[in-house]
């Protein structure tokens, strides 16, 4: 049997509106924080990163410190080494689905 490591997180965007800079710096990497400072849609940016990082943690408990997880986005695809990430948003929610890639754990 192959073990599939997945994580899912659903976030209500309004929960991350008007967060203090101290809070934001605790969960975003330095690169993410620079992007956050430039965006007008701060709550959506923060909710998306939060959902992805929570889903990563649920898929693989090795990632404890959100600030050390740097999520990149290229060609509208979110990336973090070793994981496939899917994100969707609708009105007031963001959902992230994460699967660890290359896991070959077998149980007898």
Curated annotation (Swiss-Prot):
UniProt keyword Magnesium, yes or no: yes
Example GO BP: fatty acid biosynthetic process
GO terms assigned for molecular function: holo-[acyl-carrier-protein] synthase activity; magnesium ion binding
InterPro entries assigned: 4-PPantetheinyl_Trfase_dom, 4-PPantetheinyl_Trfase_dom_sf, ACPS, Ppantetheine-prot_Trfase_dom
Primary location group: cytoplasm
EC number(s) on file: 2.7.8.7
Binding site for Mg(2+): 9, 54
Compartment(s) where it occurs, according to its Swiss-Prot or TrEMBL record: Cytoplasm
Alphabetized HAMAP family for the sequence: AcpS
Name listed for the protein in its UniProt record: Holo-[acyl-carrier-protein] synthase
Annotated organism of origin: Mycoplasmopsis pulmonis (strain UAB CTIP)
């Amino acid at each position: 049997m192959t073990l599939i490591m997945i994580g899912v997180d659903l976030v209500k965007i309004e929960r991350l509106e008007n967060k203090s800079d101290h809070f934001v710096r605790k969960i975003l990497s330095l690169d993410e924080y620079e992007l956050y400072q430039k965006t007008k849609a701060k709550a959506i940016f923060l909710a998306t990163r939060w959902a992805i990082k929570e889903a990563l943690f649920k898929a693989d408990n090795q990632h404890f410190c959100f600030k050390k997880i740097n999520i990149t986005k290229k060609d509208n695809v979110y990336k973090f080494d070793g994981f496939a990430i899917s994100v969707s948003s609708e009105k007031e929610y963001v959902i992230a689905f994460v699967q660890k890639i290359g896991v070959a754990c077998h149980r007898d």
